[in-house]
Amino acid sequence: MPSTEFSHIELSFGSFDALRAVHFARRFPPHFHDTFAIGVVEEGSCVIRTRRGEWMARPGSVLAFSPGEVHAAIPCDEQGYTYRMIYPSVEAMQELGGAFRGVFAFCAPVIDDERLSGPLREAQVPLMGEGAAVYAESLFVAALRQLGGFRVPADRRAERAAADARIVAIAHEHMAARLSDSVKLDDVAALCGVSPFHLIRIFHRAVGVTPIAYCIQLRVLRAQAMLAEGSAVADAAYACGFSDQSHLTRAFRDVVGVPPGRYLRSVQHRA
């Protein structure tokens, strides 16, 4: 039976969300998180797409995304795939030390290495409340530190050009400050000193989505933060610039994987 369950993890170096999806058969459109997203595929398979390329994720594959990395996931068949994900913040990962300091990406969003996937899954099961959690944190920390060996320093990646980075930063700051308002592409482009068409090209090249799609995902992440603090779904929708609750629900599922109401219930359950 397909199911998707959120839980919350409290560890000595931070607190963060965790997700287990069983027979997830829905296509994830391109999206990003403002946290790391790290997990393991347990059953089935899917195709992972990022601006770096395309990968096949199978049972035992580790999924690893840096904050802001746009990615899409497509199930390979109607049975879907079963996976676990944990979403540690940048601050939480930096508490682990050297391997996670500075700007970097993982060598690939899909890593096939049993030495990594075994310990990571062994740690995730008790962390998500399915077994004794006495030793879970040490297992998880050891697995994450091992994952640090698969990172690629920023200067070894095909990074966006300096001019593109400046334009994206200006656009991000403008949109992030106006999530409750109507954001128009022409206004953002004018602020950045480029044409709307050029701005779209820059965002596709540097980020992987259009400026408006990027803005919608910023709104979803803000709504998610509001729900985590106990706000009602309708209040979060209004405050984050969605036309109504159903508009938020559609966008929220595309980024988070579950409807906002279910996410809110998971927050209330752990309170």
Where are these regions (language model features)?
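Basic/polar phosphate-binding segments, predominantly the helix-turn-helix DNA-binding elements
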Residues: E173-A176, D181-L218, A237-S266
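C-terminal regulatory/oligomerization modules of transcriptional regulators
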Residues: A142, R270-A271
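Short helix-to-turn junction characteristic of helix-turn-helix DNA-binding domains
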Residues: V41, M175-L179, M226-G230
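N-terminal intrinsically disordered/low-complexity leader segments
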Residues: M1-P2, A154-A158, Q268-H269
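Short, Lys/Arg-enriched, Trp-marked, Pro/Gly-tolerant hinge/linker segments that flank
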Residues: R101-S117, R121, V125-C192, R205-Q217
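N-terminal regulatory/effector-sensing and dimerization cores
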Residues: P2-F104
